[in-house]
Regions:
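Donor-nucleotide binding loops and adjacent catalytic segments primarily
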Residues: 1-53, 87-91, 95, 102-111
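Short histidine/acidic/glycine/proline-rich micro-motifs that form metal-
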Residues: 15, 78-82, 135
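C-terminal alpha-helical cap of glycosyltransferases
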Residues: 138-156
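Two-component system phosphotransfer/interaction surface
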Residues: 108-121, 150
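A donor-sugar binding/catalytic signature common to diverse glycosyltransferases
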Residues: 44-85
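A ubiquitous structural signal for well-ordered alpha-helices
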Residues: 23, 115, 129-132, 148
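A short, well-ordered alpha-helix in the C-terminal region of glycosyltransferases
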Residues: 125-139
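Hydrophobic alpha-helical packing elements
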Residues: 108-112, 129, 141-145
Length: 156
């Protein structure tokens, strides 16, 4: 519950849909105007661009999308990945002032709500974090890859 209206869009994946149905029964809430639950999101770039704040895992492609659209984030790296790479990905954004990282072992509902509420209460800081995220984006990656491939082809 927030003083300002918040729309929470939650992508569950295949197995999370039932979890939300179970929570609805257990906790007495239902998705409505402020909570939209989807199994899969087809228009992620559009929704990321419209978001004020993104709560997400910290896979490399997800972070590249956040950087491309310049969005502040709360990142919860998955501990169940090779060499804990999501943690290191997330920490780079936090060091750059583009994200707040909460490790899963430290995550509680209360901590997440407090973190999100504090961030949403500071629109100027959110905007700054978004600019910091955008500054990390590599916009010429296609050109870089093409140049590298051309050098390989031209090398005898």
């Amino acid at each position: 519950k927030n003083a300002k209206p918040v729309l929470h869009l939650h992508a569950t994946g295949q197995y999370g849909v039932q979890l939300f149905k179970d929570l609805e029964k257990e906790k007495g809430f239902a998705p409505g105007d402020s909570l939209v639950v989807k199994e899969y999101i087809n228009n992620m770039p559009e929704l990321l661009a419209a978001a004020d704040l993104v709560i997400s895992r910290a896979g490399a492609l997800t972070l590249a999308e956040l950087e491309a659209v310049g969005r502040a984030a709360v990142l919860i790296p998955s501990p169940n990945v090779a060499e804990n790479h999501q943690y290191y990905n997330a920490m780079e954004l936090q060091k750059a002032g583009a994200a707040v990282v909460i490790e899963e072992k430290d995550l509680t509902g209360e901590k997440l709500v407090q973190t999100v509420s504090e961030m949403l209460a500071q629109p100027g800081k959110l905007a700054e974090m978004g600019k910091n995220a955008r500054s990390l984006s590599v916009d010429d990656s296609l050109d870089r890859i093409a140049d590298a491939l051309l050098k390989l082809v031209k090398t005898p």
